[in-house]
């Protein structure tokens, strides 16, 4: 049994202004927020990052400013360096190494890196042992035994399974306590559960981050043209909602939950924060503190 839900939030470089407003509320108005919820980390990568993967990044905030903000609030930073196609010559990339040094030397909570490539994982262990490693969901671990083996790897402090394992309760229950502590569920994925191209989609992002000239992946999922909609994600059989966390996952011994949203707009990411962290009766107050005033026009 776990009593605290620990959330790992998107937008380390994309949503500085949002978190600059949200985190003070989280500290000073705890009555707005659910009991037993904490922010474990904020993850992301700057735009045009060679080691980046998973999603195209568009974050432009000053890394020093974001790290100072997270130190102030005692929150871990995670670099999303989940490119699956890295080669030896890519490891010397100056920009990515500079970011790793920044996190390794920043003080405050221990920071980490989300990785796919075993080559990169080995390099980071050797050169930046201060950083913990997270096994990326871009590995698309849909077979439970492969996922179990990943949790057994000492390299990783956390492992994010494919979202289609979210409701494999009978198998998840068989994990040992130490394994459960490493599991980090992706809660709000909007991808079609029948998708067979998820790994290929991630590989396209990896190739393009390496500067390769390749076409964008064309999603064949039903309603793909709509893009991400939170309402659609909520209807997914793999969706993990607040009540699921309280009544199922915490009692089973799981406590880490990842919220996706790096490639989305800050308004939608705020809705994720409101849904997962803020009591319904206080959500309007949080909106008012962050952006909503009596002169705001939408149309």
Say what each PLM segment does.
Residues 1-150, 155-299:
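Active-site pocket-lining/capping segments in soluble small-molecule metabolic enzymes
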